[in-house]
């Protein structure tokens, strides 16, 4: 069993404060819970198990048992998980506050050891010091933490995590915060705690302490679309569906600038109990709009591209071509339920076909040209430096003509009305007959930016904001977008 979970279970009986703070879903009666998806460490009870999604941030970081309390490390309410969470720069003072909280909630002294020993020995055949019976006394104070970067903020979720070598399918990674503190001071704290234990337990305590305090930090992981659950969406089949978020709050709103001070609240039990008794939940509906989700969607589109359309003479738009084995697109994928992606695909293929027809003699769907290899990549605009490469390849294929030291290509083939409008909008109110490289880039990017302007998008979804940030955006009515009205970014 998880050491941290066991410690919470046994220490919860000590006093009123512990009974309130150390209440874990993993130690309570099991309730029906969502299915699990990934393996990793539950941030609430610190055990390595199968994880399900959090209703506060949509990340997979909570086990089936703890999910019943809907706790998130981004909450405002200073529950145990929130008090173990630190943000950005951790000072030595912040670490001292964390260690003091550990000492307050999980003390080890002669009186307590005797109390726990007597309790264990009340059971039959328990005169020996078997580790599984005293697991709660074998939790050393360490500076282990799981860390994740959300937008411009780095979060450290401290705790005692067993089985660090086990499989980790989450975006959180282990970091050793002992580098920010004095090793000798931490050693002294633990040796003092260890001195009250029987000899056989001291050996196990020391082994656990050194293995969990002398490890190398892991490299930071990058978030991906699959790290976020779809289960919080109002309608999973709608590409513009809002995400439902639940956050635990308190009546006296805490300032984000004092985020790292939450762990010091347990020093004053009466005040802490009053704060917790004022807790309530806030519900938010937030937009999916972010680079992470957009990159994922455009990546799927790029894999479904049928480049041969740009050599064809079909009268219909790219997605409406039927009975042509070279140009017909598979319309059964879920991604095509998004009208924005349909418009982007049709307009992009229409414009590239106009360029190809204006500058070459290719006129059949089955043509095998080198240009087709770069077409899928022109949809991957989220990383502009990489995107410039396939655009240059496309431009070179069009065999531009040098005019006064600058290269131009023709644009004299018919384009649809939407593309024409975008060209007029981005080319000073006209449709030019010749285009240079920058003009081609501007028009290609405008077709995507019309609906997904990644230049002004957050990297991660709004679900990763703190509760105070969500509250502030909600007051300004900026948590949702207007895509349900089919209004583009430009409009």
Curated annotation (Swiss-Prot):
<keyword id="KW-0479">Metal-binding</keyword>
<keyword id="KW-0694">RNA-binding</keyword>
<keyword id="KW-1092">Inhibition of host IRF3 by virus</keyword>
<dbReference type="GO" id="GO:0039548">
    <property type="term" value="P:symbiont-mediated suppression of host cytoplasmic pattern recognition receptor signaling pathway via inhibition of IRF3 activity"/>
</dbReference>
<keyword id="KW-0922">Interferon antiviral system evasion</keyword>
<keyword id="KW-1090">Inhibition of host innate immune response by virus</keyword>
<comment type="similarity">
    <text>Belongs to the rotavirus NSP1 family.</text>
</comment>
<feature type="region of interest" description="RNA-binding">
    <location>
        <begin position="1"/>
        <end position="81"/>
    </location>
</feature>
<keyword id="KW-1113">Inhibition of host RLR pathway by virus</keyword>
<feature type="region of interest" description="Interaction with host IRF3">
    <location>
        <begin position="320"/>
        <end position="491"/>
    </location>
</feature>
<dbReference type="GO" id="GO:0030430">
    <property type="term" value="C:host cell cytoplasm"/>
</dbReference>
<keyword id="KW-1035">Host cytoplasm</keyword>
<keyword id="KW-0945">Host-virus interaction</keyword>
<comment type="function">
    <text>Plays a role in the inhibition of host innate immunity by inducing the degradation of key host factors required to activate interferon production such as IRF3, IRF5 or IRF7. Associates with components of cullin RING ligases (CRLs) including CUL1 or CUL3, which are essential multisubunit ubiquitination complexes, to modulate their activities.</text>
</comment>
<dbReference type="InterPro" id="IPR002148">
    <property type="entry name" value="Rotavirus_NSP1"/>
</dbReference>
<keyword id="KW-0899">Viral immunoevasion</keyword>
<dbReference type="GO" id="GO:0044163">
    <property type="term" value="C:host cytoskeleton"/>
</dbReference>
<keyword id="KW-1037">Host cytoskeleton</keyword>
<keyword id="KW-1093">Inhibition of host IRF7 by virus</keyword>
<dbReference type="Pfam" id="PF00981">
    <property type="entry name" value="Rota_NS53"/>
</dbReference>
<feature type="region of interest" description="Important for cytoskeleton localization">
    <location>
        <begin position="82"/>
        <end position="176"/>
    </location>
</feature>
<protein>
    <recommendedName>
        <fullName>Non-structural protein 1</fullName>
    </recommendedName>
</protein>
<feature type="region of interest" description="Zinc-binding domain">
    <location>
        <begin position="42"/>
        <end position="79"/>
    </location>
</feature>
<dbReference type="GO" id="GO:0046872">
    <property type="term" value="F:metal ion binding"/>
</dbReference>
<feature type="short sequence motif" description="pLxIS motif">
    <location>
        <begin position="485"/>
        <end position="488"/>
    </location>
</feature>
<comment type="subunit">
    <text>Interacts (via C-terminus) with host IRF3; this interaction leads to IRF3 degradation. Interacts with host IRF7; this interaction leads to IRF7 degradation. Interacts with host CUL1 and CUL3.</text>
</comment>
<dbReference type="GO" id="GO:0003723">
    <property type="term" value="F:RNA binding"/>
</dbReference>
<dbReference type="GO" id="GO:0039557">
    <property type="term" value="P:symbiont-mediated suppression of host cytoplasmic pattern recognition receptor signaling pathway via inhibition of IRF7 activity"/>
</dbReference>
């Amino acid at each position: 069993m998880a050491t941290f979970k066991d410690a919470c279970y046994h220490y919860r009986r000590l006093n009123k404060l512990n009974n309130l703070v150390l209440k874990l879903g993993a130690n309570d009666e099991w309730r029906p819970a969502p299915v699990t998806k990934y393996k990793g460490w539950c941030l609430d009870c610190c055990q390595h198990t199968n994880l399900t999604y959090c209703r506060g941030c949509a990340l997979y970081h909570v086990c089936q048992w703890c999910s019943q309390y809907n706790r998130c490390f981004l909450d405002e309410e200073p529950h145990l998980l929130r008090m173990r969470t630190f943000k950005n720069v951790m000072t030595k003072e912040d670490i001292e506050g964390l260690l003091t909280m550990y000492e307050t909630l999980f003390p080890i002294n002669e009186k307590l050891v005797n109390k726990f020993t007597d309790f264990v020995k009340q059971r039959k055949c328990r005169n020996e010091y078997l580790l599984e019976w005293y697991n709660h006394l074998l939790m050393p104070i360490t500076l282990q933490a799981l860390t994740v970067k959300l937008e411009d903020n780095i979060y450290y979720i401290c705790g005692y995590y067993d089985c660090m070598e086990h499989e980790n399918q989450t975006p959180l990674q282990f970091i050793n915060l002992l580098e920010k503190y004095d090793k000798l001071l931490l050693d002294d704290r633990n040796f003092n705690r260890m001195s009250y234990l029987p000899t056989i337990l001291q050996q196990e305590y020391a082994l656990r302490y050194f293995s969990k305090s002398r490890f190398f930090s892991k490299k930071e992981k990058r978030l991906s679309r699959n790290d976020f659950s779809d289960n919080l969406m109002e309608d999973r089949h709608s590409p513009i569906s809002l995400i439902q978020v639940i956050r635990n709050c308190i009546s006296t709103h805490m300032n984000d600038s004092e985020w790292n001070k939450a762990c010091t609240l347990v020093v004053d039990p009466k005040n802490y109990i009053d704060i917790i008794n004022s807790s309530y939940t806030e519900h938010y509906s937030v937009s999916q709009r972010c680079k992470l989700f957009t990159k994922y969607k455009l990546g799927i589109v790029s894999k479904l591209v049928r480049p041969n359309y740009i050599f064809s003479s079909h009268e219909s738009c790219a997605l409406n071509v039927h009975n042509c084995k070279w140009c017909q697109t598979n319309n059964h994928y879920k991604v095509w339920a998004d009208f924005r992606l349909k418009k982007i695909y049709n307009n992009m293929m229409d414009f590239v076909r106009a360029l190809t027809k204006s500058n070459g003699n290719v006129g059949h769907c089955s043509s095998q040209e080198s240009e087709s290899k770069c077409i899928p990549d022109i949809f991957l605009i989220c990383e502009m430096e990489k995107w410039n490469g396939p655009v240059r390849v496309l431009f070179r294929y069009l065999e531009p003509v040098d005019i006064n030291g600058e290269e131009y290509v023709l644009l004299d083939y018919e384009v649809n009305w939407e593309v024409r409008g975008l060209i007029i909008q981005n080319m000073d109110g006209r449709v030019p007959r010749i285009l240079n490289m920058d003009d081609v880039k501007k028009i290609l990017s405008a077709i995507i930016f019309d609906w997904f302007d990644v230049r002004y998008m957050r990297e991660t979804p709004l679900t990763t904001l703190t509760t105070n940030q969500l509250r502030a955006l909600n007051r300004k009515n900026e948590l949702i977008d207007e895509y349900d009205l089919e209004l583009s970014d430009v409009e």
